[in-house]
């Protein structure tokens, strides 16, 4: 067994990739090697020791998850055959289930969601499946539809001299996994991170495993606020922040006057927006369907399977 395969097995990713009742899948061992290169860069830049393996498998370990082939480890997403390929559809929210009659063009909701969605997807092209899901704000992706792209960088103020991370004020408006992990690393590097949540829509990970929420958000200050009635307080925080991280639809911030364009620029401030798809800011994306869009799936004997957890 070569070192990359052994590392994949030892990390727990093999346990999370492959058919439910079959052997683990080793077709994506290079993913962990690349993740280790990325985390080594983070350690070099911040001084924070980061191990890629628990970052990729930690949630599954906390929740006792395992591989389920074309059902995501978390259970909310399916890899489904379409008339011309494969697609992923995610139904993690109550709103997604309520939208199924519109998706399936039926008068009543299906008694069992996934058999009905699977039968519907099989009759349509991947492009048609994704397009209709997008209309209803359901996360969906065709296998391999997305290609790698570089972040879009726009300068709206003067640059500033480089600063150490420790002592920076970070306003974290993100939720779930990607953004909170980013700000967790900044907090570990010494930044003062303020996790901002709406009373009306708190971080969705609060509804899941409490230990996962705690893991992603330890070391941060917590600030719950009414996004519709406490605009001035939010603007003050954004104006004071050295780093802003958000993952909402641009319109959600813009209509409240809280977007990067609405807050006066300041030399050295970094405003990071996390989106699922370049050039499609309103498109919903979660981890498992986004991975399928990028082609990050295991190569099962009879078709693709989910790779790891989200």
Task: List the predicted regions and their residue ranges.
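Short hydrophobic-aromatic micro-motifs
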Residues: 79-91, 222-225
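Extended active-site and interfacial segments that coordinate phosphate-rich ligands
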Residues: 103-105
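N-terminal helix-loop segment corresponding to the beta1-alpha1 unit
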Residues: 1-68, 73, 92-96, 116-137, ...
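Short acidic-hydrophobic surface loop/beta-edge motif
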Residues: 76-83, 214-216
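Charged, structured surface patches that assemble and position nucleic-acid processing machinery
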Residues: 142
């Amino acid at each position: 067994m070569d070192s990359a395969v052994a590392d994949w097995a030892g990390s727990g990713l093999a346990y999370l990739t492959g058919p439910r009742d079959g052997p683990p899948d080793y077709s994506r061992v290079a993913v962990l090697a690349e993740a280790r290169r990325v985390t080594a860069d983070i350690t070099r830049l911040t001084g924070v020791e980061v191990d890629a393996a628990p970052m990729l498998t930690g949630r599954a370990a906390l929740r006792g998850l395992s591989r389920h082939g074309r059902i995501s480890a978390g259970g909310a997403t399916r890899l489904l055959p379409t008339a011309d390929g494969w697609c992923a559809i995610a139904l993690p929210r109550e709103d997604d289930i309520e939208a199924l009659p519109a998706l399936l063009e039926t008068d009543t909701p299906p008694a069992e969601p996934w058999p009905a969605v699977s039968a519907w997807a099989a009759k349509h092209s991947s492009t048609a499946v994704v397009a209709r899901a997008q209309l209803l704000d359901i996360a969906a992706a065709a296998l391999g539809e997305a290609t790698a792209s570089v972040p879009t960088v726009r300068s709206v103020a003067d640059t500033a001299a480089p600063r150490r991370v420790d002592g920076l004020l970070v306003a974290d408006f993100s939720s779930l996994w990607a953004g909170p992990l980013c700000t967790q690393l900044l907090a570990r590097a010494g930044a003062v991170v303020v996790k901002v949540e709406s009373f009306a829509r708190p971080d969705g990970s609060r509804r899941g495993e409490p230990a996962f929420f705690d893991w992603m958000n330890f070391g941060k200050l917590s600030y719950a606020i009414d996004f519709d009635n406490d605009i001035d307080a939010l603007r003050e925080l954004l104006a004071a922040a050295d780093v802003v991280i958000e993952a909402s639809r641009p319109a959600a911030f813009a209509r409240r006057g809280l977007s990067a364009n609405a807050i006066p620029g300041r030399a050295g401030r970094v405003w990071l927006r996390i989106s699922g798809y370049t050039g499609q800011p309103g498109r919903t994306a979660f981890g498992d369907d986004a991975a399928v869009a990028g082609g990050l799936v295991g190569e099962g004997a009879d078709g693709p399977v989910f790779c790891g957890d989200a």
